[in-house]
Amino acid sequence: MQINLLSIQKNNNDEFSKIDEHYTKLIKKFCSFNEICVFNNKINQAQNTNSIEAKKSYTNALNPYKKGFCIALDEKGKEFTSVEFAKLLQDKNEITFFIGGAYGFEQEFIAQMHTSIALSKMTLVHKFAKTMLLEQIYRAFCINTNHPYHK
């Protein structure tokens, strides 16, 4: 299985990065994992213009990476229990997760996904959402392989 994680963000080396690295190592025991952080001048300029331009810039930056079973993180997406999320990931050859920028995604981008998920009804800081997703991906593998991490 191949899992791709695309996010609109600058590469940072902070406390979240250390936790993300930990879960990435654990995930790689179960599958091939590729993470790409996308942030370019067009995104930076668009975010300083307005939300519509920002969302367009996210779509343009992420469109080339749509491969396999595509899942966008979106506040209006479906909420899953950990067990339901594990079932969603089963029997897929390639899964690509998309985490948008500060303004979320264009509706057209969401419509092109196989599904969209919400990690919570609350708004989460971008970095925390990514960390939470990584932990849930690892937990899903543990559930699907009866690993004792998930009890």
Swiss-Prot record:
Q: What is its EC number?
A: 2.1.1.177
Q: Report one GO cellular component.
A: cytoplasm
Q: What is its main location?
A: cytoplasm
Catalytic activity reads: pseudouridine(1915) in 23S rRNA + S-adenosyl-L-methionine = N(3)-methylpseudouridine(1915) in 23S rRNA + S-adenosyl-L-homocysteine + H(+)
One GO molecular-function annotation for this sequence? rRNA (pseudouridine-N3-)-methyltransferase activity
Out of the domains of life, which is the source?
Answer: Bacteria
Iron-sulfur as UniProt keyword = no
Q: Which InterPro entries match?
A: Alpha/beta_knot_MTases, RlmH-like, tRNA_m1G_MTases_N
Pfam families per the UniProt record, alphabetical: SPOUT_MTase
Which keywords does this Swiss-Prot/TrEMBL entry list?
Cytoplasm, Methyltransferase, rRNA processing, S-adenosyl-L-methionine, Transferase
Which Gene3D superfamilies does this UniProt record tie to the protein? 3.40.1280.10
What residues does S-adenosyl-L-methionine bind to?
L73, G100, L119, S120, K121, M122, T123, L124
Q: Where in the cell is it found?
A: Cytoplasm
Q: Which family does it belong to?
A: Belongs to the RNA methyltransferase RlmH family.
Instruction: Provide the assembly information.
Output: Homodimer.
Job description of the protein: Specifically methylates the pseudouridine at position 1915 (m3Psi1915) in 23S rRNA.
Annotated protein name in UniProt: Ribosomal RNA large subunit methyltransferase H
Q: Which gene encodes it?
A: rlmH
